[in-house]
Structure formats: structure tokens, C-alpha cells
Amino acid sequence: MLKFFLGLFFFIVYLLHPPLGFAFDKSDPSVSLLQNRISNNFTRNYCKDINNGFSKDEAMKSAIVKTENIISFSYNPQKKWIEKDDLANQISLQVVNDCGWSFGLIGKEGVDYFKSYFLEIYEKTTPDKNFSR
């Protein structure tokens, strides 16, 4: 009988004071689609330039400028919600998976290296711009 009342007591306390839950921001599908488009465009340009014999720096700058030009003229209002770090992650994963082997980038180390390299060159190439703004 004691177990029953003790169980009932804890059940009532649980109902009166439920545990806190932490919710994540729900991602807007149109933001994800735009981010995918940007990432695909950058990766396609970068890998094409690498395969055409450009240096890493030349290919990076060229792909950034081409992608930035497309984004600048985009009227999609969702572009302001794209996080630069998320986009850099996605681009890094895609580049390493698509053509990273051709210049020695493989696995997580390759993705991390390319991400930091991308962000560094991006800041130098477009200091007053932001992919997503």
C-alpha cells in the first residue's frame, strides 16, 4: 500500500511540475533548399576549376565570386536566414566528397581543413559581403 501512495505522490508531482524540454529551432525548408542550391553551385564551380588546372586559391576565389554574384541578384528573402558557418560546413562536406580526393582532402580532417580554408579566403575575397545577406 505504501508503494502505491508513494507512486501516486510522484505521479502527481510529475504532472504538476513536468520536466523542462528544450526545443530546437525548426528549419524552414526554403532556407535549406536555398542553402543546398548555393552549396551545389559553389561545389560545381570549384571542382570544375580544380579539374581545369586552376590552383586551389584561384579556384576558391573564382567559385566564391561566381556564387556571390548569383546570390547578390537573388530576390529570395530567405537568404538572410542562412548561417555562414552552416553553409561553410555544407560546402566543405560537398567539396571533399565530390572532388577532395583529387587534391588530398579526405574524411573529417579534410572537411575541417577545407572549412577553415574556405572561411579564410572568403573573408579576404569579399570582406564587405556575406553569402547570406
Give names to the regions the model predicted.
Residues G21-D57:
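Immediate post-signal-peptide N-terminus of mature secreted/exported proteins
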Residues S62-R133:
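Compact alpha-helical subdomains of small soluble proteins
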Residues F9-F10, F42, Y122:
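Enrichment for repetitive, rod-forming helical segments
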Residues L6-L15:
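Hydrophobic helical h-region of N-terminal Sec-dependent signal peptides
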